[in-house]
Amino acid sequence: REQIAQFRGEPFTRAAGSVIPMNNLGYLANPGLLPHDPAKAKALLAEAGYPNGLTIKMIGSQMGSYETVQQLLQAQFQQSGITLELQQVEHATWHQMIRKDLNAITGYSAARFPVADIYLTQFYHSASSIGKPTAATNFSHCDVADKEIEAARTETDPAKQIEYWHEAQRKIVAHVCAVPLTATGQ
């Protein structure tokens, strides 16, 4: 996260702190993100039966802002013993392909109305999973925080609503539904 933010340039880009942007109502600053640790990743790969590493294919956008981040990710993955094979396609084609559930990993950047519910619903509620009739942008097929996302929508106490959003973020991070990389300073 930090390396990508540094590459893209502060103050416009900062390392992300959660699965929703830091300027959103309901943002949780420390949901339990793990640090970048290539040695630990290699050890975990070996323990999982991949002592020589692992290869993952990823369809990526040729759009400049996406392509550079994908190349940085490729280098970071390589440090951990993971070969990220990028298949770069034109941006509109990429949007079509990622909605066909073809990627194990999808890098995505988004701007939405600054309230946690929109991000949590579109990216992490099971009804938004790619392949469903109600699909939005849940590329990971995450379903661990549906209860909290739904409860927050109808909660009338703002403090309780924010706590539901915080708990949803903790669960999403704990289950690695997403690894947030950067946030823009817009």
Regions found by a protein language model. Give the residues of each.
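Glycine-rich phosphate/diphosphate-binding loops that line cofactor/substrate pockets in enzymes
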Residues: G49-P51
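Extracytoplasmic/peripheral linker and loop segments enriched in polar/acidic and small residues
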Residues: A5, G26, A43, Q79, ...
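Periplasmic-binding protein-like
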Residues: R1-N23, T68-V69, I172-P180
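Structural transition elements
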Residues: R14-E47, M63-T68
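Beta->alpha turn/N-cap motifs
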Residues: E90-H91, Y108-F113
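Paired acidic/hydrophobic, glycine-rich loop segments that form the ligand-binding mouth/hinge
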Residues: A104-S109, P180
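Short, well-ordered beta-strand elements
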Residues: G53-Q62, E85-Q87
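Short, polar/charged alpha-helical segment
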Residues: T68-S80
